[in-house]
């Protein structure tokens, strides 16, 4: 029997049939693969959502309310290629969630809270969709190294490039910049906001970011809004107060906060003329601590005593961000403090200066002292802190910072009579919802925030 091979026509028919089968099968395989990958991504989104509340309440004092793969991380097992950002409220309710793996993206915001049933597979977007970071989140992205300090007895001159230092404020984790700004080790805490330059001091317990005024230029040598006495009089211990009472027989009477200090009135007037257009971006719950607790001795109008900041910073070298007495917690919002601030603005504290690297009566040209040219930001002018120092012989004194005319101890903590005219460098706090716009925090490219979104 003769063997017969396939004819050309038969081969063509077979190829056509195979092609038709492939046209039917391959798209389904591809579709199933994409759907499986999309489902896997969606499962990651659900895992991230479910872990947010659990992680929030597992923290000591449920402190952090913002989580991301580059900042404070969630306790969740997810794919390595996932980028996420989640925000919760004080009850652990998710307010916003952003997840992407570069191929798929899920993004949802709801100020009233997001439930699990709101997380729908149908809302997964193919492709990567950019998400705006808050300035708070950008800080962690640009400063991935988180460290802690325990020794505050000497000026802090360690290289701190791209580093944030962790401490606590009333049990909540907060992060601060520390160290000396140099050409080779610049500290990236510059911000341009409201038409002025500022330096980031730290984050606050409410998630806002505290800024120190630096004027209209990064090279300013007059980075203060003017000069003022802390109070016009110095002959009562009550005059260390940012506000004070009508009488001073007891510490409680001295800090009833019925009258504005000279410096508060000065700062409020400057704010009214320069910053009211930007109030919506500033925290009303950030606490500015005018700590009038007694540290050594007993409160008296006739005998000497030292305030608590003296004991902490001069004797024990142990600064704190805590503020123990509600009358000393200056805030706009009474739910977070005394509610006595007219505007969301005050001064940097001596404890914040110590965390930043400063020490009493010791050469300390730290970032808060220098401009971008590494000269004194205030020239020869000393400038006020918010912290009381001591009372002695009809003389009330508060902490301040040396200018360049003290060649032995430039930038160090010092003290002045409260009726002395020092430079005034206000501090404000950008809300946690303030969106990052541009910049990397350097003097040549300061952080800027979006003026049309976030808050």
Name what the model sees in each region.
Residues 2-29:
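N-terminal single-pass transmembrane signal-anchor helix
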Residues 63-96, 100-102, 108-109, 122-455:
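Long, domain-scale functional regions
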Residues 112-113:
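Flexible, surface-exposed loop regions and adjacent strand-edge segments
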Residues 116-120:
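Intrinsically disordered, low-complexity regions of secreted protein precursors
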């Amino acid at each position: 029997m003769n063997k017969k091979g396939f004819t050309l026509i038969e081969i063509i028919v077979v190829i056509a049939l195979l092609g038709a089968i492939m046209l039917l099968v391959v798209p389904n395989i591809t579709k199933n693969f994409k759907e499986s990958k999309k489902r896997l991504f969606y499962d990651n989104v659900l895992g991230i959502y479910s872990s947010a509340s659990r992680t929030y309440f597992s923290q000591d004092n449920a402190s952090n309310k913002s989580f991301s793969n580059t900042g404070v991380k969630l306790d969740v097992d997810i794919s390595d290629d996932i980028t996420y950002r989640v925000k919760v409220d004080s009850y652990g309710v998710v307010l916003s969630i952003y997840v992407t793996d570069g191929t798929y993206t899920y993004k949802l915001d709801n100020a009233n809270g997001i439930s699990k049933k709101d997380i729908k597979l149908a809302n997964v977007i193919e492709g990567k969709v950019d998400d705006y970071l808050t300035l708070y989140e950008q800080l962690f992205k640009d400063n991935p190294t988180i460290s802690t300090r325990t020794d505050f007895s000497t000026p802090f001159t360690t290289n701190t490039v791209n580093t944030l230092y962790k401490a606590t404020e009333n049990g909540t984790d907060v992060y601060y910049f520390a160290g000396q700004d140099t050409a080779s080790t610049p500290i990236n805490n510059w911000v341009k906001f409201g038409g002025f330059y500022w330096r980031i001091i730290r984050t606050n317990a409410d998630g806002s970011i505290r800024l120190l005024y630096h004027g209209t230029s990064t090279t300013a040598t007059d980075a203060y809004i003017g000069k003022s006495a802390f109070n016009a009089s110095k002959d009562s211990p009550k005059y260390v107060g940012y506000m004070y009472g009508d009488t001073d027989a007891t510490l409680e009477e001295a800090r009833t906060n019925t009258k504005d200090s000279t410096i508060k009135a000065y700062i409020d007037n400057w704010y009214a003329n320069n910053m009211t257009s930007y109030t919506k971006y500033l925290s009303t719950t950030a606490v500015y601590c005018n700590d009038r607790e007694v540290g050594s001795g007993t409160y008296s109008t006739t005998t000497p005593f030292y305030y608590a900041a003296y004991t902490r910073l001069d004797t024990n070298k142990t600064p704190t961000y805590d503020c123990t007495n509600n009358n000393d917690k200056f805030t706009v919002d009474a739910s977070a403090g005394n509610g006595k601030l007219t505007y969301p603005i005050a001064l940097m504290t001596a404890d914040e200066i110590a965390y930043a690297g400063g020490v009493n009566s010791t050469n300390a040209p730290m970032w808060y002292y220098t401009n971008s040219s590494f000269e004194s930001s205030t020239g020869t002018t000393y400038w006020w802190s918010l912290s009381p120092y001591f009372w002695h012989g009809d003389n009330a004194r508060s902490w301040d910072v040396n200018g360049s005319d003290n060649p032995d101890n430039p930038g160090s903590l010092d003290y002045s009579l409260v009726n002395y005219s020092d430079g005034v460098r206000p501090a404000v706090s950008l809300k946690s919802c303030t969106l990052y716009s541009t910049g990397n925090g350097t003097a040549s490219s300061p952080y800027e925030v979006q003026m049309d979104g976030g808050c």
